[in-house]
Amino acid sequence: MRIAILGFGSEGQAMLAALKRDPVYRSATITVLDRNKKTSVPKNVRAVAGPAYLDNLRQFDLIFRTPGFPFMNAKLQAARRKGVKVSSVTRYFFEHAPCAIIGITGTKGKGTTTTLLYEILKRTGRSVYLAGNIGLPAVALLPRLRKNDLVILELSSFQLQDLDRSPQVAGVLEIFPDHQDAHRDMKEYVEAKSSIARNQKPDDRVFFADSGWSRWVAKFGKGKKIAVLPSRTRLIAPADMAVPGMHNFRNAVMASAIAASLDVPKETIRDAVRAFRGLEHRLEFVREVGRIRFYDDSASTNPDTAAAACRSFEDPAVLIAGGKDKNLDYATLAKALKDSVVEHVVLFGENREKIWKALSGGHVPAEFASSLEEAVASAYRAARLFSAQHAAVIFSPGAASFDMFKNYKDRGRRFKMIVRSL
């Protein structure tokens, strides 16, 4: 059998190790495919690396794609039509996991929700694992998993799109437009998300945010459907939160509701929420310079999350935004700015003019910067002119990072380095 692994980051490497362990595939010829021409692979493993890495997909019997590679890629679909079987690292994990899986999806907040839920469940003494973008690749956990364990898994639209199984417990956060550069339209994006509930069994549960697309996804569940309403929760209160923003409170309510359904005591939930300090690059406090507080929200890659960041503060603020465009509409951000404490905007990156046009006609002055260094300097200068006792500089790009950086983490680390040098 000729097998290809599509992508050779941490997930692809874990997939290779899993195939080497699996007696079904032990004798297969495995080839690694990766865009990066400097990709290094183990001995006895073939590699096709560089710009032409997708040119001969039809030669394989089976292709495992890693989470970051879209199922609807034209060359992958062409190979599929010619009879090549296409699976994924996530699908392999669902087929082989011996224990219950809790899956969380949504447009943003997945990492925060999964991590907080993990922190809550850890306090009960249960054997629980966190996997996905945060934690280990899920397939790397397979050798150690046992029947009574729990795995909490962050699931993106790319991972869910061709999944034919659903987690026993699903959490659906708010869904709004994203990845429109990789999905044909919003309908395809939301239909991909629906796989988190579509294959559930009658004893399974789906928790969902009470918003339009989230309700639509949840309706496919065959088990119990639970609407999660922050305004009605008695488990936690906004005052219990150490991280700013009502969007973070909504994430915490989702994690708390799922934990409560697993019989976690209310006080255990509340203690974990109070101790939770959030995740890196998600409205992360960096430092205070004079009376100016700097926040890193580099994980914000669409206008809705940037809008949420702007609504999270009470002190006057400067917003730094911009990056690689994903065919998204910035009207949401423009509307949020009108009702927020943001008094100045600094735009940089590939789509800075697109964002500026969306903001035109608003009452918030904006300026351009040619680099992140220049953007931070301009934002700091503007914030120092505010008369309030404290002010904030919010780095919430609302766009992808690939125009100037490796990824959002690289972008966030660069921002923090610049701020610490002030």
Task: Please give the residue ranges for each predicted region.
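Short internal beta-strands
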Residues: 30-35, 206-210, 320-321, 341-350
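Active-site regions of enzymes building and remodeling cell-envelope glycoconjugates
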Residues: 42-52, 60, 83-84, 99-102, ...
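Residues in the short beta-alpha loop(s) of Rossmann-like NAD(P)-binding domains
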Residues: 9, 36, 134, 210-212, ...
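Residue-level signal for inorganic ion chemistry
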Residues: 19, 63, 104, 133, ...
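Nucleotide phosphate-binding/pyrophosphate-handling subdomain across enzymes
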Residues: 12-18, 127, 241-342
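C-terminal helical cap/extension that packs against the catalytic core
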Residues: 41-44, 331-391
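Phosphate-binding loop of NTP-binding sites
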Residues: 20, 54-58, 67-224, 377, ...
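N-terminal leader/targeting and accessory segments in enzymes
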Residues: 1-88, 92, 244, 367
